[in-house]
Amino acid sequence: MVWKRLGALVMFPLQMIYLVVKAAVGLVLPAKLRDLSRENVLITGGGRGIGRQLAREFAERGARKIVLWGRTEKCLKETTEEIRQMGTECHYFICDVGNREEVYQTAKAVREKVGDITILVNNAAVVHGKSLMDSDDDALLKSQHINTLGQFWTTKAFLPRMLELQNGHIVCLNSVLALSAIPGAIDYCTSKASAFAFMESLTLGLLDCPGVSATTVLPFHTSTEMFQGMRVRFPNLFPPLKPETVARRTVEAVQLNQALLLLPWTMHALVILKSILPQAALEEIHKFSGTYTCMNTFKGRT
């Protein structure tokens, strides 16, 4: 027993070195991308913004079928028609992911009409863009139901079949605000932090589940209607990401079976700074960059 423990202590650092070297090599040498031709993809919030771009990207990369969920039928119809014109089978369903029973009922309808979902992209989200004391209680609940609990319900609806098939992928379109919150978006930041913890736990829980993986994407501010009006102090230094960039990198992460994706790569510095700098220094960074007041001009989706 003692020798086994000593052996484990010796092997563990060697294993860590091997994994670090392997990851470094992967950054230099192109890896083989996963074939999507047999995959059925479901995207929540798929009618517009990043969701629409994700549908385009999956279609361009050969996904077999694409299913869109959302609450606005006009947007869902437009995106569905566009994907069909690209030559990919596409369907849409009206579904509020914040409503548990509606999620389960719609998931059943999807299985009956389309078949098994093998890639689930949890993209649906809302933001009210207010401080705690200025926020309506119902609005706060809505954010948590859609942004966080909605992922519980969709994952519970589709993961069991993925485990049976030993083929599946759960994707969470999160936000860098899950790691570094800002004033004026307390509902959104809280829900995204919760969703990040959810995915971190889920990813670890899938380690012994062959063929089923998870990916969490943490993008910086993206130029969509959702955060319309948001302004940082130095827009040339901190330009918003394009939705098509986020979509392309997200699908690539799925094909590479990448567990965590921070966009842009400079956001890795944020993780390091938060772990070593004192709170006072972090507060000065918020003030200097303009994230302290960036929601003052927030308008949101109109």
From Swiss-Prot:
It is a multi-pass membrane protein. Widely expressed with highest levels found in heart, placenta, lung, liver, kidney, pancreas, thyroid, testis, stomach, trachea and spinal cord. Lower levels found in skeletal muscle, intestine and lymph node. No expression detected in brain. In the retina, expressed in cone but not rod outer segments. CDD domains: 17beta-HSDXI-like_SDR_c. GO terms for biological process: bone morphogenesis; cardiac septum morphogenesis; negative regulation of retinoic acid receptor signaling pathway; outflow tract morphogenesis; regulation of ossification; regulation of retinoic acid receptor signaling pathway; retinoid metabolic process; retinol metabolic process. Its EC number is 1.1.1.300. The active site is at residue 188. The keyword Oxidoreductase applies. It is found in: Membrane. It catalyses: all-trans-retinol + NADP(+) = all-trans-retinal + NADPH + H(+). It comes from the Eukaryota. It is an enzyme of class 1 (oxidoreductase). GO terms for cellular component: endoplasmic reticulum membrane; lipid droplet; photoreceptor outer segment membrane. Induction: By retinoic acid. The chain crosses the membrane at residues 9-29, 170-190, 195-215, 253-273. Substrate binds at residue 175. GO terms for molecular function: all-trans-retinol dehydrogenase (NAD+) activity; all-trans-retinol dehydrogenase (NADP+) activity; electron transfer activity; nucleotide binding. Keywords: Lipid metabolism, Membrane, NADP, Oxidoreductase, Transmembrane, Transmembrane helix. Its main location: membrane. PANTHER family: PKSB, SHORT-CHAIN DEHYDROGENASE_REDUCTASE 3. Located in a region of chromosome 1 which is often deleted in aggressive neuroblastoma tumors. Catalyzes the reduction of all-trans-retinal to all-trans-retinol in the presence of NADPH. Belongs to the short-chain dehydrogenases/reductases (SDR) family. This is Short-chain dehydrogenase/reductase 3. It comes from Homo sapiens (Human). The gene is DHRS3.
